[in-house]
A protein has these predicted regions:
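Short loop/turn segments that flank or connect secondary-structure elements
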Residues: 3-201
Length: 201
């Protein structure tokens, strides 16, 4: 596949990977953040066109578990909408809460789609953008930019990652493989090892 180091970016195949993905420590800390990333922000989670049908199929499974407000939004505009940048995103309630978010018995935010997936009620986990977070993808010409999004609501994840010695690319192994494939991820590991040899990590 081949790779090349750019200033603060690494090219792997047809992707350009942010150096932050290698450098930053990251490990989700749900017990601290309580899943706030599902209910904060001013737009829904990015959705691929081919994921819309999967969202609609998942809706049939989890509709009864959604809040009345979320069901009303979905009834009015569907499971997705175009945000101010024209990107397709999940529908939201009151300008911030994902319609597929709910609360567990301890008040933490959970994804109803992923809950159904873990319980074997749906074959699909959730949108790849959610699975990949804090990575965000963006098309740049013929390339896909693999960017690392730093958000203050994830501050505890940076602390936990550093404490455990887990880099972002390691924590995100499974979603990165799901999105880009095993060969791509193996190349990412080669890059990481080379960066370590050069004392860049």
């Amino acid at each position: 596949m081949g790779w090349g180091l750019l200033i603060f970016m690494v090219q792997i195949g047809d992707t350009i990977v942010s150096f932050d993905l290698f450098q930053e420590y990251f490990c989700c800390n749900f017990s601290h953040c309580r899943g706030i990333c599902c209910v904060e922000g001013d737009a829904g989670a990015p959705v691929l066109f081919e994921e819309v049908e999967k969202l609609e199929e998942a809706l049939e499974v989890i509709a009864s578990e959604m809040t009345p407000e979320a069901r009303a939004v979905v009834d009015e505009q569907g499971v997705v909408y175009n945000d101010r940048d024209g990107d397709l995103v999940t529908s939201i309630v009151n300008g911030k809460d994902c319609v597929f978010a709910s609360r567990d018995e301890n008040g933490g935010c959970i994804c109803l789609i992923e809950k159904a997936y873990r319980e074997g009620r749906t074959p699909w986990r959730k949108p790849i953008s959610c699975y990949l977070y804090p990575v965000r993808l963006r098309k740049v010409g013929d390339f896909t930019a693999v960017n690392f999004h730093k958000w203050d609501v994830c501050s505890s994840a940076f602390i936990k990652g550093r404490r455990k010695g887990i880099r972002a690319y390691e924590f995100l192994k499974e979603p990165l493989i799901e999105r880009f494939g095993r060969e791509w991820y193996d190349e990412l590991l080669v890059v990481a090892e080379e960066l370590k040899k050069q004392n860049m990590l």
